[in-house]
UniProtKB/Swiss-Prot annotation:
Compartment(s) of residence: Cell membrane
Taxonomic classification: Eukaryota, Metazoa, Chordata, Craniata, Vertebrata
Pfam families for this protein: 7tm_4
Record protein name field: Olfactory receptor 51A7
Function text: Odorant receptor.
Topology of this chain in the membrane: Multi-pass membrane protein
């Protein structure tokens, strides 16, 4: 009896970088380094926020949520990417593939949700600073975190089940070194219309998050322009720089990939694979760096911890 009902395919094949399979071991070095830095950076953010009472504020709680989603993205894709690039082990069972998709898409939706509530945080801090603390209480922040986690799970939990009901006859070659819903459903030899529609719905949810983020920044910009002092304008705008960088590093690869899939007639498979890998590697790596550099309270606390360790 096969892994999937009436299916012939027992194994999906992942792909590294086409034509450069002989150099996979060399590509694995920067990939491993990026994963290591991403995990260390996000763990550092979480540790500093947890251990420093002065950082127990809404802005930093949301940053901790972003670090959790970044670590989730990294750890979800890490096993298969390392297997492909380190050991040229391309095979993955359908059930393992579906499980990986659940976590990758789940943490993607979670990151999108976190970026949205972080934009709300910036809007409240700039537009209504006097009521900021009374509106975003610790209890409300915890409830928001719980809601976005539940939202992420509920949105992606149908993915594994809708994929399991499909039949996979002959095609088994995936397009990346990890599993994605839109990639796997194309291998099916049965009707995948439900998967196409639901995948489009999830994409719309993510784009709705982006639209609301853009709207929040329109309102933020309107508020900033109403401030009389130029120095105060720049100070208010500077508090948004880290979040804007996080939004760009997360959404630009997604939008670029979607545009290439829909509009580029002669797209290069190599370019598509590199951009897809950037989507999972760059945000978890860059977010801790950007927030540590741009947020004085964080790098001061990190520096203080390092000096305490060195002084012992």
């Amino acid at each position: 009896m096969s892994v999937l009902n009436n299916s012939e395919v027992k194994l999906f094949l992942l792909i590294g970088i086409p034509g450069l399979e002989h150099a996979h071991i060399w590509f694995s070095i920067p990939i491993c380094l990026m994963y290591l830095l991403a995990i260390m950076g996000n763990c550092t953010i979480l540790f500093i926020i947890k251990t420093e009472p002065s950082l127990h504020e809404p802005m930093y709680y949301f940053l901790a949520m972003l670090a959790v989603s970044d670590m989730g993205l990294s750890l979800s894709s890490l096993p298969t990417m390392l297997r492909v690039f380190l050991f040229n082990a391309m095979g993955i069972s359908p059930n393992a593939c579906f499980a990986q998709e659940f976590f990758i898409h789940g943490f993607t939706v979670m990151e999108s949700s976190v970026l949205l509530i972080m934009s709300l945080d910036r809007f409240l801090a700039i537009h209504n600073p006097l009521r900021y603390s009374s509106i975003l209480t610790s209890n409300r922040v915890a409830k928001m975190g719980l809601i976005l986690a539940i939202r992420s799970i509920l949105l992606v939990i149908p993915f594994p089940f809708t994929l399991r009901r499909l039949k996979y006859c002959q095609k088994n070659l995936l397009s990346h070194s990890y599993c994605l819903h839109q990639d796997t459903m194309k291998l099916a030899c049965s009707d995948n219309k439900t998967n196409v529609i639901y995948g489009f719905f999830i994409a719309l949810c993510t784009m709705l998050d982006l639209a609301l983020i853009v709207l929040s920044y329109v309102l933020i910009l309107k508020t900033i322009l109403s401030i009389a002092s130029l120095a105060e304008r720049l100070k208010a705008l500077n508090t948004c720089v880290s979040h804007i960088c996080a939004v760009l590093t997360f959404y630009v690869p997604i939008i670029t990939l979607a545009a290439m899939h829909h509009f580029a007639k002669h797209k290069s498979p190599l370019v598509v694979i590199l951009i897809a890998d950037m989507f999972l590697l760059v945000p978890p790596l860059m977010n801790p760096i950007v927030y540590c550099v741009k947020t004085r309270q964080i790098w001061e606390k990190i520096l203080g911890k390092l000096l305490n360790v060195c002084g012992r």
